[in-house]
Amino acid sequence: MIRCIYSPFTDIYFHLAAEEYLLKQGNEDIFMLWQDTPSVVIGKHQRLLSEVDQEWAEREQVHIARRFSGGGAVYHDLGNVNLTFIETTPRLPEFVTYLQRTLDFLSSMGLMATGGERLGIYLNGLKISGSAQCLYKDRVLYHCTLLYDTDLTALHQALNPEPMVDDETLSSVYAVPSVRSEVTNIRRHVPAGTVTDFKEKAFQYFSKSQSVSAFTREEIEAINQLREEKYIQKEWIYSR
């Protein structure tokens, strides 16, 4: 049975810590649905200054975070929905199977979405989802964004920093640059509905109508400790 978590929190640092904790400290298969207040999240191997308009983010009080999985930079806000799958597997997984789960969900809503070579998801050639993944021992984590009603102006501003003179050289040597794509919101392609409606549909679909599992007190304490010791630390966020 899969443990299904519908997170009541909206803190990017808590959620990144929760993912790492649940991956490394548990043995349950987990599905988690979550959202964050405005945040920019870069991959573990990315160079922050090449991916984020830091001055704009700080001025607009947009959080800047680094996750422990790879992949490119993404923008989160309360119009964006995030899905996380954590499973124990005896062999190297094919991550496209996780992508297909999301495509099947979108198909259930009448959306003819397609997957891309970098495990992105597209509607009419415009990106609505990016994903990343990582392995830990016999455990796998796959997570993705779903742009439902995101502030796309803020997204473009956050993820388009001023080019630096040495940016191309440094990025190619030391870090993994994001591949830019034109984006759209899912809401433009479905009958009118709120992001809450969309979240409910997503949770019901992936949880197979199982009940919501809450974080335990012990988990919250451990996750918050990891949040404080790692994810909010400048040494981690600005490590490249």
Name what the model sees in each region.
Residues M1-P93:
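N-terminal lobe of the biotin/lipoate ligase/transferase fold
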Residues L33, I64-R66, A113-E117, L123, ...:
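General beta-strand structural signal in soluble alpha/beta enzymes
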Residues W34-D36, D77-G79, G115, D138-V140, ...:
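A short, structural micro-pattern
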Residues S39, N80-N82, R118, K127, ...:
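Broad gene-expression machinery/nucleic-acid interaction feature
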Residues S50-V52, P90-V96, A154-H156, T194-D197:
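Short, conserved charged micro-motifs
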Residues D77-Y122:
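Contiguous, small/hydrophobic- and glycine-enriched helical/loop subdomains that border
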Residues Q100-F105, M109-M112, K127-R240:
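Long, positively charged amphipathic alpha-helical accessory segments at protein N-termini or as interdomain linkers
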